[in-house]
Swiss-Prot record:
This is 14-3-3 protein 1. Belongs to the 14-3-3 family. GO terms for biological process: protein localization; signal transduction. It comes from the Eukaryota. GO terms for cellular component: cytoplasm. Transmembrane segments: none annotated. Gene3D superfamilies: 14-3-3 domain.
Length: 249
């Protein structure tokens, strides 16, 4: 679907919400990209920022799920020594990877050219740097060799920069700070295979938030406690995995 040239910021916003309701997330991405580029150096509102995140999260989410399914079928076919099918599956996987790369490149360009430079508040800086880390992490999930190494390094840089600002400017119970700790710890566990570091990061974020629970505002209570639950779920899973590995060793 070609976008009309002269859409206003309000029209882009309305159409993005419409596309979200219709679950047409690729178009939602286009409307939000157009909104960002059209607004130049002026900052996004919290609503606009969240819509941009939702749009890309849905598009990348279905592609990541597709990649995981295709990869597991590829392993099964290799196990069966079915060479003809393996060739077809590999080719199909590379098409999905090409789409993943394009989506990541799209949001990373928007973040670097528009959103990160224009962010003034600590909260929005952390939000965008976390997002940058997330999309480099999604690249690291399927890239191999040097490309994987570079994607992992870029993920680390973005998450570290976000963490520095989050610790200095956001409360331990702030949902964006908690979400960053959640994703950063997943990066340590899944991409760097550093399970102890992943556990200590998740545990620290959880405990710091628990200590300040009584100071939490109504508006973020639900978001924060949901992320805290996810941190605790990961900790439970990771520590039992580590215990199993130690038992096997």
């Amino acid at each position: 679907m070609a976008l009309p040239e002269n859409l206003t910021r309000e029209q882009c916003l309305y159409l993005a919400k419409l596309a979200e309701q219709a679950e047409r997330y690729e178009e939602m991405v286009k409307f939000m990209d157009k909104l960002v580029i059209g607004s130049g150096s002026s900052e996004l509102t919290v609503e606009e920022r969240n819509l941009l995140s939702v749009a890309y999260k849905n598009v990348i989410g279905s592609l990541r799920a597709a990649w995981r399914i295709v990869s597991s079928i590829e392993q099964k076919e290799e196990g069966r020594k079915n060479d003809e099918h393996v060739v077809l599956v590999k080719d199909y996987r590379s098409k999905v990877e090409s789409e993943l790369s394009d989506v990541c490149a799209g949001i990373l360009k928007i973040l670097d050219q528009y959103l990160i430079p224009s962010a003034s508040a600590g909260e929005s800086k952390v939000f965008y740097l976390k997002m940058k880390g997330d999309y480099y992490r999604y690249l690291a999930e399927f890239k191999v060799g040097n490309e994987r190494k570079e994607a992992a390094e870029d993920t680390m840089l973005a998450y570290k920069a976000a963490q520095d600002i989050a610790v200095a400017e956001l409360a331990p119970t702030h949902p964006i700070r908690l979400g960053l700790a959640l994703n950063f710890s997943v990066f340590y566990y899944e991409i760097l295979n550093a399970s102890e570091k992943a556990c200590s990061m998740a545990k620290q974020a959880f405990e710091e938030a628990i200590a300040e629970l009584d100071t939490m505002g109504e508006e973020s209570y639900k978001d924060s406690t949901l992320i805290m639950q996810l941190l605790r779920d990961n900790l439970t899973l990771w520590t039992s995995d580590m215990q199993e590995q130690m038992d096997e060793a």
